[in-house]
Each structure stands twice: as C-alpha cells, then as structure tokens.
C-alpha cells in the first residue's frame, strides 16, 4: 500500500500532467477497439483529486487533432492540446501548421513505432522544421507497445540523438522514459539541451509495489546524470489516474536503504511544475 511520506504543498506554478488522453486507444487493435472515454467533468474531477491544475491532452492514431481541440475548448484554463501527424506522409508539414494556427494545438505527439518510420528519417524533417519555427514541442512515443504492428527499432534513442542535433531549437519530449532503453534515453537528454523526458506509465503493473522501485531507480540514474531537472510528470491518463501516481511520487524514497540514495523531494516535486514551465513546454 502506498502511503505519502511527503506532503504535496502549495506551489506558485500550476502543476501539470504532461501526458493524458481522452480515450484509451494507443494499445487497441484498430479492428477490435477497446475504448474508454472520459467526460470533461470526470477529467477535471480526477485532476482535482490528484492536486493537478492542468493537463496536456494528446492526439493519437485514432483520436484526431480536431477531437482533442474541441475537448480542450471546453476548459481552456485546464487543458492544453497536442496534435498528431505521420511526418513522413506528403502534406504533413502543412497539416502541422494548420493544427497550430487553425485548431490552436500547442504541440505534436508522434508515433514512430506504430506508424512505421524512424524518427531520424529525413522525410520527417519537414515537420520538425515547421514545429521548430512555430515553437511547437514534439512528444515522441518513445517506448514499446504490446501490439503486433509496433516496432521497437523505431524507438531507439540514437535516432533522437540525430534529430536533436539537426534541430537544436526543437523541444523534444521522450515519453515513458524511453522504456526499455531508459539509460540511453537519459543520456540523450544529458547530451542535448532541447531533449526532455516524461515519466508516464513506463512499466507493466502500475499498482504493484515494484513499480515504485523501478521508477525510483530510474530517477536516481537521472539525478546521477544531471538530468533530473529535465524530467516532467505525466500519467498516461485515463490508463493511470493522477492521485495514485502523485501518491507514488510522495513515497518515491521507500526503497532507499541509505540517505545517500534518497531523491531530493523538492526536485522530485519540480517535475510537476518548474521543470515544465521553465523549459517552455507549455504556454
């Protein structure tokens, strides 16, 4: 059972869940979808229960940018929308521009693993150019997905290394800590000032006590590499609700067997707000 060892105190900056959806679609078989939808009221109630002020809502392969934009308009003080394109397709650069200028979406979510391209494919560069020009952060789904059409080879941190080098002004967020290539992902964040990571649902059973241990271990690696301040909070809502994930962070040091192995809680809490706002990852 998770018990809070640290109190979530009032802070000056809005706390943000940087990785949310309005449907569970990422893991669904397109031919046999299993979709759980949430209403605006349910979403806001869950945010309040978790002590979170705002949420980044992501488009994906079957939740359109228009759907996300319309949902965000219901509570613009709470919701920040991200669009979606397949960047190797013709016209995806124009679509990116429209999603920002016409739909009002702030960033993009890309799925190289399931859309079948490498992030460093030069055909995708036209989208990176537009996103960089418009100051649109790009979040990459940077982990495996347990579906037949997913290819782990397209979530290699070495590919992001190339993109970050070619587009130094492009803000890149690597979702799920790059699991299972966590250490390599953190190293890319260390190498490039424009690369960040979120901690959304990177492992199997989020309700198992070992989940806290795995996240603690990876955040300790981030601390050692000097990139803990480039890690941002995210849940993968509605798959994971905000309250239990925040509770887990409050108890993140439960497996630290020595004071030297404890994560500094003020910097852990920065993942919810300061790390997001100070790097311009939200408006």
Residue positions per predicted region:
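Mid-to-C-terminal alpha-helical segments outside catalytic/metal-binding sites
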Residues: 1-14, 18, 31-54, 225-230, ...
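Histidine-centered divalent metal-coordination motifs
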Residues: 14, 19-25, 141, 176
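Conserved, mostly hydrophobic/aromatic
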Residues: 19, 47, 68, 108, ...
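Divalent metal-dependent hydrolysis catalytic cores, especially in the metallo-beta-lactamase
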Residues: 20, 32-36, 40-62, 79-84, ...
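Acidic/histidine-rich helix-loop elements
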Residues: 21-38, 147, 207
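Short, acidic/polar
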Residues: 35-46, 89-100, 182
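Active-site gating/metal-coordination segments in enzymes
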Residues: 62-155
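Catalytic pocket-lining loop regions of alpha/beta-barrel enzymes
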Residues: 106-107, 120-232
């Amino acid at each position: 059972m998770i018990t809070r060892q640290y109190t979530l105190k009032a802070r000056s900056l809005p706390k943000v869940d940087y990785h949310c959806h309005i449907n569970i679609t990422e893991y669904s078989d397109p031919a046999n979808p299993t979709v759980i939808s949430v209403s605006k009221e349910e979403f806001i109630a869950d945010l309040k229960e978790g002590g979170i002020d705002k949420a980044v809502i992501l488009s994906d392969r079957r939740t359109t940018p228009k759907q996300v934009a319309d949902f965000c308009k219901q509570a613009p003080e709470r919701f920040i929308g991200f669009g979606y394109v397949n960047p190797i397709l013709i016209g995806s650069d124009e679509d990116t521009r429209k999603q920002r200028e016409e739909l009002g979406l702030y960033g993009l979510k890309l799925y190289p693993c399931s859309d079948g391209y490498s992030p460093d494919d030069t055909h995708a560069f036209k989208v990176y150019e537009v996103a960089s020009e418009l100051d649109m952060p790009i979040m990459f789904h940077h982990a495996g997905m347990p579906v037949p059409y997913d290819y782990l080879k397209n979530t290699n941190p070495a590919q992001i290394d190339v993109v970050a080098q070619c587009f130094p002004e492009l803000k890149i967020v690597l979702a799920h800590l790059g699991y299972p290539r966590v250490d390599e992902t953190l190293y890319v964040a260390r190498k490039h000032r424009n690369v960040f990571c979120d901690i959304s649902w990177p492992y199997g059973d989020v309700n198992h006590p070992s989940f806290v241990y795995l996240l603690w271990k990876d955040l300790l690696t981030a601390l050692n590499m000097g990139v803990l301040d480039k890690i941002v909070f995210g849940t993968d809502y509605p798959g994971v609700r905000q309250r239990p994930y925040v509770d887990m962070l409050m108890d993140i040091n439960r497996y630290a067997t020595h004071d030297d192995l404890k994560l500094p809680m003020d910097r852990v809490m920065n993942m919810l707000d300061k790390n997001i706002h100070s790097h311009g990852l939200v408006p």
